[in-house]
Amino acid sequence: DGCPPHPVPGMHPCMCTNTC
């Protein structure tokens, strides 16, 4: 999906989901 890796499986970093 073009998003950088995230430490929590099934979740995306803020810059991808725009939610923190």
UniProtKB/Swiss-Prot annotation:
User: Record's superkingdom?
Assistant: Eukaryota
Q: Which GO terms describe its cellular component?
A: extracellular region; host cell postsynaptic membrane
Q: GO MF annotations for this entry?
A: acetylcholine receptor inhibitor activity; ion channel regulator activity; toxin activity
Expressing tissues: Expressed by the venom duct.
Q: Which cysteines are joined by disulfide bonds?
A: 3-16, 14-20
- Primary localization: secreted
Swiss-Prot/TrEMBL keywords: Acetylcholine receptor inhibiting toxin, Disulfide bond, Ion channel impairing toxin, Neurotoxin, Postsynaptic neurotoxin, Secreted, Toxin
Q: What subcellular locations does the record give?
A: Secreted
Share the domain note from the entry.
Answer: The cysteine framework is XIV (C-C-C-C).
Report the function annotation for this chain: Alpha-conotoxins act on postsynaptic membranes, they bind to the nicotinic acetylcholine receptors (nAChR) and thus inhibit them.
- Family per record: Belongs to the conotoxin A superfamily.
Its recorded name reads Alpha-conotoxin-like ts14a
Lineage of source species: Eukaryota, Metazoa, Spiralia, Lophotrochozoa, Mollusca
